[in-house]
A protein has these predicted regions:
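Juxtamembrane cytosolic interface motif at the C-terminal end of transmembrane helices
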Residues: 21-23
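N-terminal secretory signal peptides that target proteins for export/translocation
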Residues: 1-5
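Extended, histidine- and acidic-residue-enriched regions that form the cofactor-binding/catalytic faces
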Residues: 25-117, 122-127, 138-150, 157-316
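Bacterial N-terminal signal peptides
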Residues: 10-19
Length: 316
């Protein structure tokens, strides 16, 4: 049977058109990404609360899939004039909360019974030695590390003796785990913004929605007492930083320790609370906490990938 060339050409063209039409109906693959551009990062899911202890285990597990950051406020309980005895812990917790909000971290609360340092004359003071505090805190730090919180940042505010507990804690934790933790003295950050520490205490209660815990129109009874002239002289000649540096042991009365001992009105409490909260916020902003937590991550990576393999004789 003779088939002309035109018929063959027509049939071939028709088959090609049918194939093209059929292919057009198939699902199409997405276009390839532009060379050199990474896919847009998926934002981490928001946490319901910043407080570790208020999350469910499911929420903690989910958080640890994309982050490993936890802020740990450390405080004490001691007599402090018109303020509740936990005020220095509250100040540390408020600052830790603000830092966590800045960096998508969590807060590990309730660690408020450590060495109070000065001002321990008073039955409202719970005395815990630095050694006892470290012995309590270190297992918690190690547990948090095992759980996945590799970046631990410890915060104190208001207690000059806090380094007696927290500095040895972070050092011993590093020697034992080879994981650097960070200790931030909130007082240093607050001084950089010229904060008034009494107002900071009021602001901290406001940040934590506990302002009503500060009593109104209340004047504490401070026993009349002599001045420790020897300690006063040592301080003036800068030969001793007191309990902070472990150079000389001492105790103080509330008024000597700088605690507010005059009655506070409702208007004054509200005004100081707002000013103090603003000071805490300013101190955290000035510190650039996102840079701090990234730097801690970089330091940990350098330690793990360079220092430890190269210098196996690091303290154990």
């Amino acid at each position: 049977m003779f088939v002309s060339g035109k018929s063959v050409l027509f049939a071939g063209t028709l088959s090609l058109l049918i194939a093209v039409a059929a292919r057009a109906q198939l699902p199409q693959a997405p276009p390839p990404p532009t060379p050199g551009l990474a896919p847009a990062p998926v934002p981490p899911p928001p946490v319901r609360t910043r407080y570790f202890t208020s999350l469910t285990n499911i929420e903690v597990e989910k958080y640890l899939q994309y982050n490993d950051l936890i802020f740990i406020p450390i405080g004490n309980v001691q007599a402090y004039g018109v303020l509740p005895v936990d005020c220095e812990y509250v100040a540390a917790e408020a600052m830790a909360l603000k830092m966590a909000e800045e960096t998508d971290g969590l807060v590990f609360p309730y660690l408020q019974f450590t060495y109070p340092g000065d001002g321990i004359i008073g039955r409202g003071t719970v005395h815990v030695s630095p050694a006892a505090g470290i012995a309590y805190l270190k297992p918690i730090a190690r547990s948090l590390l095992r759980q996945g919180f590799k970046r631990q940042i410890y915060i104190t505010v208001g207690n000059n003796a806090a380094p007696e507990t927290v500095s040895p804690l972070v050092l011993e934790f590093f020697y034992e785990t080879k994981t650097p933790a960070l200790y931030i003295e909130g007082d240093v950050l607050l001084r950089k913004v010229n904060a008034d520490f009494t107002k900071v205490m009021f602001g901290a209660y406001s940040v934590l929605n506990r302002l009503d815990d500060i009593p109104l129109n209340f004047t504490p009874t401070v026993a009349k007492h002599d001045i420790d002239q020897g300690l006063a002289t040592l301080r003036m000649i800068n030969s001793s930083g007191g309990a902070r540096d472990g150079i000389v042991g001492f105790v103080m009365f509330e008024d000597d320790a700088g605690a507010p001992v005059k009655a506070v009105t409702a208007e004054q409490r509200a005004a100081w609370a707002k000013e103090g909260a603003d000071m805490i916020e300013a101190a955290v902003k000035q510190a650039d906490m996102k840079k701090v937590v990234q730097s801690l991550l970089d330091h940990q990576r350098f330690t793990r990938e360079y220092l430890i393999p190269k210098f196996d004789s690091l303290p154990r």
